[in-house]
From Swiss-Prot:
Its EC number is 3.1.3.-. The record marks 147 as: Enhances dephosphorylation of CheY-P. It is an enzyme of class 3 (hydrolase). It comes from the Bacteria. Disulfide bonds: none annotated. The keyword DNA-binding does not apply. It comes from Escherichia coli O157:H7. InterPro entries: Chemotax_Pase_CheZ, CheZ_family_phosphatases. It is found in: Cytoplasm. This is Protein phosphatase CheZ.
Amino acid sequence: MMQPSIKPADEHSAGDIIARIGSLTRMLRDSLRELGLDQAIAEAAEAIPDARDRLYYVVQMTAQAAERALNSVEASQPHQDQMEKSAKALTQRWDDWFADPIDLADARELVTDTRKFLADVPAHTSFTNAQLLEIMMAQDFQDLTGQVIKRMMDVIQEIERQLLMVLLENIPEQESRPKRENQSLLNGPQVDTSKAGVVASQDQVDDLLDSLGF
């Protein structure tokens, strides 16, 4: 027994589909022009390469700061290790002397070594302080990168706002797709789709896109 042939859900020919896509594209372009959004979208598109360059700048500045900090730590480590080793050795020698006092000649040598250690400490600490200052100065990139990131966030928000305005103005309510069955969105904020630019939070953006089937 032959199985009945299954007709495709969309009976439009390829030519009809292409014609409809072309018509929708023309309608979208005309609507953008009428709303004055074409220039805004163009500016947003031009901002994308600029944002990419800014991201690269942030990466460079962060990498340079990390390298400066690591170099300072590596330079300071031998000085700290030397002071620690010398201090432990002198402490052990003094403990031994107090437990069993040695001859005056040996005691004089211990005192001389201790004085030498104390005389060397300022040089080690001065070098370490200079490296700590270098680490602190390396963090100045945060001011610059913070400004760059803020600018990028503004660009992204503007692109999102313009795209939402296009959706709101060009998708009739009766043609919007059914909402996805997602209970977490049923109690979300209500959005007045009769006005452009009224979306106030990311949750509202998600709800709006969900209601449109995107």
